Amino acid sequence: MTGANKEQSGQIKILLVDDEEGYVNVLAKRMAKRQVEVMIALSGAEAIQTLRKNDFDVAVVDLKMEDMDGIEVLKIFKKMDPELPVVMLTGHGSEKAARDGLALGAFDYLTKPCDLEELLATIIKAAEQRSE
């Protein structure tokens, strides 16, 4: 979605990638109330297919997933859409991997469970960067 489309719709469109279905459903419902349109992918493979078919302002990707880790997803996303800001989510103890993600082009990382306001602020900042 281009910056102009985002301005017309008033929403930020994100791809939320995490294999914890309950967690992402709660986040998606809470973000929808804040003018954030969320598409959910419950695996890395599903995320790649979803990105092929849709445009997003930001991707939010968990580092630890069953089928492929968030670093692999980040690398593929950056090949598919080099300008897509990717925010990594990490559990305690995997911050080194998140920093590795930053070195590979991730926009930022947050530790789970993350505060919704902090996540939204990071998403908005990332979307603004994309629309510049």
Language-model segments: which ranges?
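Charged docking surfaces used in two-component/phosphorelay signaling
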Residues: 25-33
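C-terminal output helix
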Residues: 96, 114-124
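Non-catalytic signal-transmission and effector/linker regions of two-component phosphorelay proteins
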Residues: 1-13, 121-132
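Short amphipathic alpha-helix used as the core "switch/output" element in two-component signaling
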Residues: 49, 71-83
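Acidic catalytic/metal-coordinating carboxylates
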Residues: 43-46, 69-72, 93
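Receiver (REC) domain active-site loop signature in two-component systems and cognate sites
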Residues: 65
